[in-house]
Amino acid sequence: MSWTVRASADFWATVRPFKDKYPEREYLAIIRTIREAIVELEEKGFVSETGWDDHRLMKKPFDDGNYFEFHIHDDDVLVVYFKRVRRQTIRMIGVFSHLTIPSE
């Protein structure tokens, strides 16, 4: 069962602030890891990599049961996605730190 995963230019723009925060080698590793995770999402509909802690978000504005996140790069980079199970579609939302993730 394959999933359709959409990662727009707006999604990738949320990765750019990490370029200033990390050395180039680490920044490129973050991008590479996100791309690998997208491939896994296409194949499985979830990320099963040990230590990435793929889970449903419970706080507003992501608390409707369809938003998920996984943690990469020493748990400091949070990747958020929206999953529509019935249509087997995943939309990548954004990449945040613990300080920058939107909350109400």
What are these regions (language model features)?
Residues 36, 52, 91-94:
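N-terminal functional modules and adjacent low-complexity/disordered segments of proteins
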Residues 1, 20-24, 28, 65-104:
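Enriched for short, Lys/Arg-rich terminal
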Residues 9, 16, 44, 60, ...:
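Short non-domain terminal segments
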